[in-house]
């Protein structure tokens, strides 16, 4: 293992160890992976931004899109590091300019996301960033918004992946390359 690979492995372990697991939250049987504990640790937070930025440094991405709300915390610094614009995708009524919206299914009901109509240009190569990949529903809705504006979603990046919930497989089937810093078993 090279020094660089060894450093990366150490950083990934440090990041994973900084994420607290809360049992039975928000309901019994769920193991909640709390990324806010990573944010409280500047060394782990910095390492996560560094690793994501390095991973996409040669990707040709022209925009980074972050989903509300924790996607902003990782997407905006990655966009700065890559020297590209950051675009927020938000809940309805939170963006001041003209928007388009996309509804998507939740376990119990539906939710909606919005994006400014002038934030993505036709041909933009987009990296979508969020804190956690579970079923992929939120990211799928985000991808639909970007594609409706003419953007090409080439990558999706996450701090945490919960592979058992199928989100990565769902997005991969749509031609989206997924990258996660760490994975956890269970829900």
Curated annotation (Swiss-Prot):
* Entry GO MF terms: adenine phosphoribosyltransferase activity
Q: Which family does it belong to?
A: Belongs to the purine/pyrimidine phosphoribosyltransferase family.
CDD domains xrefs: PRTases_typeI
Record note on quaternary structure: Homodimer.
Entry function: Catalyzes a salvage reaction resulting in the formation of AMP, that is energically less costly than de novo synthesis.
Please list the reactions this protein catalyses: AMP + diphosphate = 5-phospho-alpha-D-ribose 1-diphosphate + adenine
Species per Swiss-Prot/TrEMBL record: Yersinia pseudotuberculosis serotype I (strain IP32953)
For this entry, the protein name equals: Adenine phosphoribosyltransferase
Question: According to its UniProt record, where is this protein located?
Answer: Cytoplasm
């Amino acid at each position: 293992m090279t020094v660089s690979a060894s450093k990366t492995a150490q950083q990934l372990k440090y990041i994973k160890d900084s994420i607290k697991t809360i049992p039975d939250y928000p309901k019994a049987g769920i193991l909640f992976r709390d990324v806010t504990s990573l944010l409280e640790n500047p060394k782990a937070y910095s390492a996560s931004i560094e690793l994501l930025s390095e991973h996409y440094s040669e990707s040709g991405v022209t925009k980074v899109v972050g989903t509300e709300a924790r996607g902003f915390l990782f997407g905006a610094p990655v966009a700065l590091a890559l020297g590209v614009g950051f675009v927020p995708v938000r809940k309805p009524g939170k963006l001041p300019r003209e928007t388009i919206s996309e509804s998507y299914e939740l376990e119990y009901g539906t939710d909606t996301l919005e994006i400014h109509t002038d934030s993505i240009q036709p041909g933009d190569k987009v990296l979508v960033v969020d804190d956690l990949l579970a079923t992929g529903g939120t990211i799928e809705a985000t991808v639909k918004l970007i594609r409706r504006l003419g953007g090409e979603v080439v990558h999706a990046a996450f701090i945490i992946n919960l592979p058992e919930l199928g989100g990565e497989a769902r997005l991969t089937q749509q031609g989206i390359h997924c990258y996660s810093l760490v994975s956890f078993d269970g829900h």
